[in-house]
Amino acid sequence: FFFEDEKRYGDRRGFEIASLLAGDDQEGIFQNCTVWDILAGKTIAVKNLRNGEIFYISCDKLVVAAGAIPLLPVFANDDLPGVYTAAVVQKMMNRELTLLGKHVLTVGAGNIGYLTSYQLRQAGANVKAIIEALPAEGGFPVQADRVRRLGIPILTGKILLEAVPSPDGKRVSGAVIADADNFQPVPGTEKLLTGIDLINICAGLAPDNKLLRKGREIFGVDCYG
């Protein structure tokens, strides 16, 4: 990802790699479409998200590459406006040129936590801290050093307990964190962080394997993930 040989597209962005692999003849590549269901008889039901059309594709083998979905740790008031996953923060910042908050707490000291915190700082936000429940930092040291040089503290062994609502209850205004022992809060170590309007969740990813499970029911050993 960071150090691939150029022959393996290590010098290119993801959208550039997709264009290269698709080539000029894009027959058989269906954009703006999603797999609606996997049916008996090795048939894939596909829905066009733009016009609502549903069509069917029959095949002998199936490869599922559905990616992953963000993990959202459980904490009080996790549904408040101002609590977002890194994917949402990045999309709004990079594509919509919109900061979802100016005073940020990042949850998760891994490469994504470092990267989004760095980008947020470049965009003008104040990243107050990056917290990590594990006792040690994750990710590449070069990424951690990059945010540390910006003066962003990385606090290990800390867990998020609560997103504190604003007085009108309409958004985040702070957070309660505590020392962590095996992902459990240590009683009596709670600390209130004030002046936060964005909690940036970078707690990792889980495989999006629902289609893979369904595919293996229909295709058996001819379904790959």
What are these regions (language model features)?
Residues 1-225:
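Residues forming the flavin
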